[in-house]
Amino acid sequence: MRVAVLSAFLSTCLATGTAAAATAEKFAGVDLSYVNEVEACGAQYRLDGKLRDPYELFAERGANLVRLRLWNDPTWTQYSNEADVTRSIERAHRAGMHVLLDFHYSDDWADPQQQRIPAAWAADIDDADKLAQHVYEYTRDVLARLNERGLLPYMVQVGNEINTQMLRADKTTGLPIDWARNAKILNAGIRAVRAAHAKDGSSPKVMLHVAQPENVEPWFAAAVEAGVGRVDYIGVSYYPKWSKLNMSQAQAALERVRKRFDTDFIVVEVSYPFTLRDAGDGAANLLGADSLLKGYPATLQGQDRFMNDVVRMTRNAGGVGVVYWEPAWVSSTCSTRWGQGSHWENATLFDFKKGNELTPAASFLRAIRAP
């Protein structure tokens, strides 16, 4: 680590007014990327037995941020493309919530295991300058089209769970990261977000997102050394299934991140099962017994306790938000490429055993925003 580089990064963050966690706006979030799709397949949501619109319901329960993923050109689905995301942003704004737009920079899922380059950019995979240009122009153009409709997001993720090399070939590990290449790509995305301005002159906030608390500090240290530009928020995924850390260890890791980089963080992906059963559909669930932490059983009460403890962990570590991943991906007649139904219905915030009634764990939304 070059101390001068780190010092310059921290000075820039301070100069742009990075707020202390104690005074920063608190974000209570829900990732609703699947809602349009499952509603088209007949999904319904209830509170006290009455049918409810999920956007309006979550806003009433305290949510002020909706996270939405964006794929470049997903020819295998009509959802999570630009047209679908535009509809979702409109719904979020009607419900009075901010939007965090999550650019995957892929035609498919992007995560630590895979960061497949979009097909339209594949010919330039070995040219970092051309890739940076693609990222800049794509990000700029999407945000410009949204801005024309008054839908510029409040916050933008430049990549999703970018623990490994971005824009790479399929069936590659992405490790070790080529940081010269990665920095060009990331900085291009950051510049494009900074260049977008709403009518009031404001620009979207910028986030970089890493999966699992134990990976955040080393990743950002390497990014700073490589010259990756400042960001407004650090995004973190925390899933006990894939993390080596329990709650107290995760808190300690995130507290170090907050202090070392003097940048607010948000847990932008977290979920927990309320049962180990499924809804009887044809899609195997991703979160099973291997996803449980001691003291948090797969029950409605266990899910509620886990989420409210995640809120406490986040606040104690200096974080400013928690976003539940896919709380509304309930079972329906829709199919994924791996089965009919949902792979997540036991970890949503709707109890399929009670007609998709809102679960008690939704209380975390008000808890994260409490004074």
Residue ranges of model-derived segments:
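Hydrophobic faces of well-ordered beta-strands that scaffold small-molecule active sites
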Residues: 28-32, 66-68, 99-103, 154-158, ...
